[in-house]
C-alpha cells in the first residue's frame, strides 16, 4: 500500500467544485408493495426528468460512453429487472440517482440493502388498498437510518378509499406523521385534480398516458372558476381543506429530514398526474448526500463528510451472472466522499490491499454506460471477480469501514441436498463463498449441516444456478422447519455455555462465526427469550460485525 498515502480528514474547507457537485445530487429509492404502481412511477419520473421521450426510448447522459453487452438476454431468461435497478438523469440543474427496489419474485435481501444506499425514499401507496405488508417491511428498513420519506398515494383515477382513512392508516400502521401537501378532488370517474395546500392552487386532472404535460392551474381555493368547473365537488373540497388546516400537521422540513413526518401527495402515475410535484419535492426538500458514520478502529468511529476530497464508499449489492460467458459479477458501490475518476487506485480496506478502479459503470434504464467521473451520492458498478463482498469499503488510503449495511433475519430457510454425495466439499466451498459475498445467508448447525436463509424465494433459485455454473454442484433445496433466526449476544462465557448446552441443535453459526438462534416458531422464540432475559436476540447485524 506504499503508493497510496493514508488520507486524513482535512481541516481546510471542502474543494468548492466538489462541494457544488455534491449539493446537486439527489439519491433516492422507491418503495411499495407489488402492484401499487412503482414501476409506472419510475418510468414517469424518467419521462418528466427528460431521460426518456416516450415509454421505452432512453437517453443516456451526454458525457457517457456506451459499453455494449448481451446481459439483457440473461435478464429475460431470469425474469429479473436488473438493468433498471439504478438510473441516473439530469433534471433542473440536479443529478438524480433513482434506485429501484425489486418487488414480486425479485424480492430478496438486495431489496432491503438498496435502501442503505439512498438519502431519501418515495413511498407509493395504492389508494384502493392502503398500507400493505411489503411496504411495512421496507419502511422498517428506512427507519434504521431515519431516511426521509415522501408519500405518493397513487391510482386516484380509480374507485379508492377515503383520503382521511388512508392518512390515518399510514400514521397508525407505519408510525409516521402525515402532512398533506396536495389533496384530491373526487376519485375514480369523478377525479378532477388536486388542491396544493402550500401554494393555494388547484391542478386540474386530464387523463393522458404518453407524453409529459403541464396540468392546468387555477389559483386560489375561493376562486369562482372552481364553482363553474367542479360544482358538485368544490363544496366538499373546501370543507376537507378547512378540516386539514385545522387538524393535520403542517409540513415541517426538520421533521421530514429526521424521518418523523412524511409529506403526502395524491395523483395518478399512469396519467402523469402528480409526478412533477414529487420531482419538485425531491429537489426542494430531499437532502443532498449526507455524512456517513464509518469505523476507524474497533471502538472508534467518525463522520465522513460527502465533500471531503479523499474518495470512499461501500458495496451494497452484488449482481452475478449478468454475462454468463464471463461469469460477470457487478458490485454496486455507493460513493460517500471525494471524486471517482477512471483508473484511480484505491485501498480495499478488508483485504488491506490496493486495487485499480477502471471501466466502472453507471446505469441508465436499459443501458450500461462507462462512468467518467462521479461524486458522493452516485452509484457505480465495479466488475467483480470475487474480491468484493457486500459491506466492503474502498478508500484512497484511510482505514475506514462504513456502518449501517445490515444482514436481516431471513424469512425462508432451506437445507441443501446433493444429487452427487461426492461433491460435498465443492458444496461447502460454494456456500461459504456465496455466503461471504452476501448472495445468501449460510448457517452451520451442530454436526456440520448447512442451512440457507433468504428473504425471497428468488435467492434460492439464483444460488442453485450459481452452484451449478460456478462450482459444478447440482443441489436441491428442501424447505427447513425454521421460523426465524436471531443473532445472539451473551453477557458472559458461562451464560453462553449454558445456553448452548440447553438449546443444542437450535444454535448455529453464521458465515462470520457469530452464534445464531434458529427458532422453530414464534412461540418457541418468545419462550426462549423469556427464559434467557440476559441474552440479546437481534433481528439484524452489521456486515463484518463480530458479536460477543
Curated annotation (Swiss-Prot):
A single Gene Ontology biological process assigned to it is: regulation of translational termination
For binding GTP, which residues are annotated in this chain's numbering?
32-39, 100-104, 154-157
* Main location class: cytoplasm
Q: Which UniProt keywords apply?
A: Cytoplasm, GTP-binding, Nucleotide-binding, Protein biosynthesis
State a single Gene Ontology molecular function: GTP binding
Q: Which Pfam families does this entry report, sorted A to Z?
A: EF-G_D2 (PF22042), GTP_EFTU (PF00009), RF3_C (PF16658)
**Taking every annotated instance into account, which residue ranges of this chain make up the domain tr-type G?**
23-290
Question: Which GO cellular component terms are attached?
Answer: cytosol
Write out the annotated subcellular location.
Cytoplasm
Q: Which residues form a coiled coil?
A: none
SUPFAM superfamilies per record:
EF-G C-terminal domain-like (SSF54980), P-loop containing nucleoside triphosphate hydrolases (SSF52540), Translation proteins (SSF50447)
What is the annotated signal peptide range for this record?
Answer: none
Q: Which InterPro entries match?
A: EF-G-like_DII (IPR053905), EFG_III/V (IPR035647), G_TR_CS (IPR031157), P-loop_NTPase (IPR027417), PrfC (IPR004548), RF3_C (IPR032090), RF3_dom_3_sf (IPR038467), RF3_GTP-bd (IPR041732)
Q: Which family does it belong to?
A: Belongs to the TRAFAC class translation factor GTPase superfamily. Classic translation factor GTPase family. PrfC subfamily.
Q: What does the record give as the function of this protein? A: Increases the formation of ribosomal termination complexes and stimulates activities of RF-1 and RF-2. It binds guanine nucleotides and has strong preference for UGA stop codons. It may interact directly with the ribosome. The stimulation of RF-1 and RF-2 is significantly reduced by GTP and GDP, but not by GMP.
**HAMAP family the record matches:** Rel_fac_3 (MF_00072)
Instruction: Report what the protein is called.
Output: Peptide chain release factor 3
- Name of the coding gene: prfC
Amino acid at each position: 500500500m506504499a503508493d497510496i498515502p493514508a488520507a486524513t480528514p482535512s481541516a481546510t474547507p471542502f474543494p468548492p467544485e466538489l462541494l457544488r457537485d455534491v449539493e446537486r445530487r439527489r439519491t433516492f429509492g422507491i418503495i411499495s408493495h407489488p402492484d401499487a404502481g412503482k414501476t409506472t412511477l419510475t418510468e414517469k419520473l424518467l419521462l418528466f426528468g427528460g431521460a426518456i421521450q416516450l415509454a421505452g426510448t432512453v437517453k443516456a447522459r451526454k458525457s457517457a460512453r456506451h459499453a455494449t453487452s448481451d446481459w439483457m438476454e440473461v435478464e429475460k431468461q431470469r425474469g429479473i429487472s436488473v438493468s433498471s435497478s439504478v438510473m441516473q438523469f439530469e433534471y433542473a440543474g440536479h443529478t438524480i440517482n433513482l434506485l429501484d427496489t425489486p418487488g414480486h419474485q425479485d424480492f430478496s435481501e438486495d431489496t432491503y440493502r438498496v435502501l442503505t444506499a439512498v438519502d431519501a425514499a418515495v413511498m407509493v401507496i395504492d389508494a384502493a388498498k392502503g398500507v400493505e405488508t411489503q411496504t411495512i417491511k421496507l419502511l422498517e428498513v428506512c427507519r434504521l437510518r431515519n431516511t426521509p420519506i415522501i408519500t405518493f398515494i397513487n391510482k386516484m383515477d380509480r374507485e379508492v378509499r377515503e383520503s382521511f382513512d388512508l392518512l390515518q392508516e399510514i400514521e397508525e400502521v407505519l408510525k409516521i406523521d402525515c402532512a398533506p401537501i396536495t389533496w384530491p378532488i373526487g376519485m375514480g370517474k369523478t377525479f378532477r385534480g388536486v388542491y396544493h395546500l402550500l401554494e393555494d392552487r388547484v391542478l386540474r386532472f386530464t387523463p393522458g398516458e404518453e407524453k409529459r404535460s403541464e396540468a392546468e392551474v387555477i389559483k386560489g381555493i375561493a376562486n369562482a372558476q372552481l364553482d363553474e368547473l367542479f360544482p358538485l365537488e368544490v363544496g366538499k373540497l373546501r370543507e376537507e381543506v378547512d378540516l386539514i388546516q385545522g387538524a393535520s400537521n403542517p409540513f415541517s422540513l426538520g421533521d421530514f429530514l429526521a424521518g418523523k413526518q412524511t409529506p403526502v401527495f395524491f395523483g395518478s402515475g399512469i396519467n402523469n398526474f402528480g409526478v412533477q410535484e414529487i420531482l419538485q419535492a425531491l429537489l426542494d426538500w430531499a437532502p443532498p448526500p449526507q455524512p456517513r458514520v464509518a469505523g476507524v478502529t474497533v471502538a472508534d468511529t467518525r463522520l465522513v463528510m460527502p465533500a471531503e476530497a479523499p474518495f470512499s464508499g461501500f458495496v451494497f449489492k452484488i449482481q452475478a451472472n449478468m454475462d454468463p460467458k464471463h461469469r460477470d459479477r457487478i458490485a454496486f458501490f455507493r460513493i460517500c466522499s471525494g471524486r471517482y475518476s477512471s483508473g484511480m487506485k484505491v485501498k480495499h480496506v478488508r483485504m488491506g490491499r490496493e486495487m485499480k478502479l477502471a471501466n466502472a459503470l453507471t446505469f441508465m434504464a436499459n443501458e450500461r454506460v462507462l462512468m467518467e467521473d462521479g461524486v458522493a451520492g452516485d452509484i457505480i458498478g465495479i466488475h467483480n471477480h470475487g474480491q468484493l463482498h457486500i459491506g466492503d469499503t474502498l478508500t484512497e488510503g484511510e482505514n475506514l469501514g462504513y456502518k449501517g449495511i445490515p444482514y436481516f433475519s431471513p424469512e425462508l430457510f432451506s437445507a441443501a441436498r446433493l444429487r452427487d454425495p461426492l461433491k460435498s466439499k465443492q458444496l461447502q466451498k460454494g456456500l461459504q463463498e456465496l455466503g461471504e459475498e452476501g448472495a445468501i445467508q449460510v448457517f452451520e448447525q451442530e454436526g456440520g449441516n448447512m442451512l440457507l436463509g433468504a428473504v425471497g424465494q428468488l435467492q434460492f433459485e439464483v444460488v442453485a444456478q450459481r452452484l451449478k455454473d460456478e462450482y459444478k454442484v447440482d443441489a436441491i433445496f428442501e424447505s427447513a422447519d425454521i421460523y426465524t433466526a436471531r443473532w445472539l449476544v451473551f453477557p458472559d462465557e458461562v451464560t453462553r455455555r449454558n445456553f448452548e448446552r440447553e438449546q443444542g441443535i437450535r444454535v448455529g453459526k453464521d458465515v462470520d462465526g457469530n452464534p445464531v438462534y434458529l427458532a422453530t416458531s414464534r412461540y418457541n422464540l418468545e419462550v426462549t427469550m423469556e427464559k434467557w432475559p440476559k441474552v440479546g436476540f437481534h433481528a439484524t447485524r452489521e456486515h463484518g460485525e463480530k458479536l460477543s
